[in-house]
Amino acid sequence: MESQGYAFARTARVAALAGALLLMAAGLAAQPSVQKIIDYIDTNYEVRSDMTAQARITTKDPDQGTKVIESVYYRRDRDDAFLIVIAEPETDRGNGYLRVGDNMWMYRRNTRTFTHIGRDEKIGGSNASAGDIETRKFKELYKPSVDSSGREILSEETLGGAKIPVYRLEVVAKVNDVKFPKLVMWVTRDKYLELKRESYSLSGTLLETSYFTNYKEVEGRYVPLLWKFVDEVEKGRTSLFEIIGIAFEKVEDYMFDKKYLETLSK
């Protein structure tokens, strides 16, 4: 009887262990890969039509105070061209940023000159850059980061006081023309919306922390209407990028031309 009882207990322990392993395996199988999460993010951010948006950038600097920039953003879908026209403050009115093809320019009204710029050019002196406005696909720019054993760096966490269920993942650049070579991202587990991002240098120094909130569903896609950029190098410096109004209507081709920006200055 004792041997039978021992055998029964051992069988029960083995069954319990097997069940736990099966549950763990099921959980691992249900967890998407980092690449799959990146694909979901690309799908969410994908815009399939021309777009016009009113945007406000509020930059707070401990030395220079607060600056508010009002602008209008135009995007042409067929070639991903975009135009940003500054409306306020008065000192910057008529300045702009134009991207057509692989070329990007900054226009200054007071000198009526165009300067060829890179994706890391800051818009109006804020922490938001020209590259942040582009709609380049994540999968074309970044790849999953792996640990010493070759496994993707991916975990399940909760974020913020609301304890939002998120995936925490790490990616590294696979092209050279990106603003940051390494990113750590927090993405919701249900709709794959990016809520937080930490941006690092090659040496592993944290350079910027970004937050994406106030998502709005538009034509089956989700657009963050509020972006916050926290400068981790210049402490106390932050930029808030707000989309005030957004419309998906055709934008005329003549607007994506240097001549159009010049006419606004007359």
Listing of model-derived features with the role each one plays in the protein:
Residues 32-110, 150:
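N-terminal mature ectodomain segment of secretory-pathway/periplasmic proteins
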Residues 26-32:
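Bacterial Sec-dependent signal peptides at the C-terminal "C-region" and cleavage site
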Residues 113-117, 130-133, 156-258:
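Gly/Pro-enriched, hydrophobic low-complexity segments
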Residues 2-17:
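Bacterial N-terminal signal peptides that target proteins for export
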Residues 35-36, 135-153, 204-209:
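A short, amphipathic edge element
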Residues 58, 78, 87-89, 102-103, ...:
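Solvent-exposed coil/turn segments that connect beta secondary-structure elements
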Residues 15-26:
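Bacterial N-terminal signal peptides
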Residues 108-139:
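Acidic/charged, solvent-exposed loop-and-adjacent secondary-structure segments enriched in E/D, K/R, S/T
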